[in-house]
Amino acid sequence: MPQLNPNPWFTILIFTWAVFLTILPNKVTSHKMPNELLTKDPSNLLTEIWYWPWH
């Protein structure tokens, strides 16, 4: 049974993980958010109680 021969599949596995661990992290981390997140001052946030009209 050729499926049980680990020789070609093991090398494919090693090369695939080598690509995943060397090339892809650089491509993923090079992306930047288009909009910077703004931090709001927590003292300006006013929360009001909102009563639901249950009829």
Swiss-Prot record:
Q: Which GO terms describe its cellular component?
A: mitochondrial membrane; proton-transporting ATP synthase complex
- Alphabetical list of Pfam families matching this protein: ATP-synt_8
Q: In terms of one coarse class, where is the protein primarily found?
A: mitochondrion
Top-rank lineage group of the source organism: Eukaryota
Q: Which GO terms describe its biological process?
A: proton motive force-driven ATP synthesis
Molecular function GO terms recorded: proton transmembrane transporter activity
Q: Where in the cell is it found?
A: Mitochondrion membrane
Bilayer topology term: Single-pass membrane protein
Keywords, in A-Z order? ATP synthesis, CF(0), Hydrogen ion transport, Ion transport, Membrane, Mitochondrion, Transmembrane, Transmembrane helix, Transport
Show the stretches that span the lipid bilayer.
4-24
How would you summarize the oligomeric state and partners of this protein?
F-type ATPases have 2 components, CF(1) - the catalytic core - and CF(0) - the membrane proton channel.
Q: What does this chain do?
A: Mitochondrial membrane ATP synthase (F(1)F(0) ATP synthase or Complex V) produces ATP from ADP in the presence of a proton gradient across the membrane which is generated by electron transport complexes of the respiratory chain. F-type ATPases consist of two structural domains, F(1) - containing the extramembraneous catalytic core and F(0) - containing the membrane proton channel, linked together by a central stalk and a peripheral stalk. During catalysis, ATP synthesis in the catalytic domain of F(1) is coupled via a rotary mechanism of the central stalk subunits to proton translocation.
PANTHER family listed in its UniProt record: ATP SYNTHASE PROTEIN 8
Which family does the entry's similarity section mention?
A: Belongs to the ATPase protein 8 family.
Under which name does UniProt file this protein? ATP synthase protein 8
Which organism does this sequence originate in? Polypterus ornatipinnis (Ornate bichir)
The gene designation is: mt-atp8
